[in-house]
Amino acid sequence: MTRIIVVTSGKGGVGKTTSSAAIGTGLAQKGKKTIVIDFDIGLRNLDLIMGCERRVVYDFINVIQGDATLNQAIIKDKKTNNLFILPASQTRDKDALTRIGVEKVLTELIKMNFDFIICDSPAGIETGAILAIYFADEAIITTNPEVSSVRDSDRILGIISSKSKRAEKNITPIKEYLLLTRYNPRRVKKGEMLSMTDVLDILQIPIIGVIPEDQSVLRASNQGESIILDINSNAGCAYSDTVNRLLGEERHFRFIEEEKKSFLRRLFGR
């Protein structure tokens, strides 16, 4: 059975698209047929992060408006088997995204036997965000450990509970998970960031992953590669743990405590 997962947030710049790409790639690595859809009409960042921007001929809106078939618009990832991308339009009006159009595309993808459909939502409550949430079975709320980011995530939780198809039909609600990004235990210790416990106390939803602040994320993005492919990076390992939890496996949370320096590192001040 296909699982439709929206990756969303109340605030921009929290690593939502990076997370969508990493989770989609990780699921495909596990043998799950996965497609990542960019709902951010007008910006189109997903294909850049996944390194396929030059291969975009048709997009999500072309399919909705009947200018192309889904098979024409879907891009197969060259690095990872089982991984596909449906890019957003960079030039179209955001209102070109319609509920009927999105439902048609999702229904067709389900018929194509995708195991996972990852919906990369724009931040906030614009049309793309509402439609990405509307059809979801599960939601990953991406937030930084900062008061403003957590507060905006709380607003998104309200939208998920009231504006989804599941809420309308009064059936099992969307499963909600917290993904905490750019976590820095040293700054938490200094009181410059909220702790994981603080965020959980505020949002009151299960946590699926904690992604540490890591310069490797920017390097991977600039190279058009998903960070999860960098197995030597802390962020890549944390995303891998997140994917395993999404598949029902238990993983302890790494990178949530300040790394203790060895004697030599303390001696030489490194």
Swiss-Prot record:
Kindly give the CDD domains that the UniProt entry links to this protein.
MinD
Q: Which UniProt keywords apply?
A: ATP-binding, Cell cycle, Cell division, Cell membrane, Membrane, Nucleotide-binding, Septation
Q: What is its main location?
A: membrane
Localization, per the record, is: Cell membrane
The UniProt entry lists membrane topology as: Peripheral membrane protein
Q: Name one GO cellular component term.
A: cytosol
Q: Identify the residues that bind ATP.
A: K11, G12, G13, V14, G15, K16, T17, T18
- List the GO biological process terms: division septum assembly; negative regulation of cell division
The domain of life is Bacteria
Matching entries from InterPro entries are given as: AAA_dom, MinD, MinD_FleN, P-loop_NTPase, ParA/MinD_ATPase
Secretion signal span: none
Q: Which GO terms describe its molecular function?
A: ATP binding; ATP hydrolysis activity
Q: Subunit info?
A: Interacts with MinC and FtsZ.
Its function, per the record, reads: ATPase required for the correct placement of the division site. Cell division inhibitors MinC and MinD act in concert to form an inhibitor capable of blocking formation of the polar Z ring septums. Rapidly oscillates between the poles of the cell to destabilize FtsZ filaments that have formed before they mature into polar Z rings.
| Family, as annotated | Belongs to the ParA family. MinD subfamily.
Record-given protein name: Septum site-determining protein MinD
Organism of provenance = Buchnera aphidicola subsp. Acyrthosiphon pisum (strain APS)
Q: What is this organism's lineage?
A: Bacteria, Pseudomonadati, Pseudomonadota, Gammaproteobacteria, Enterobacterales
What gene name does this entry carry? minD
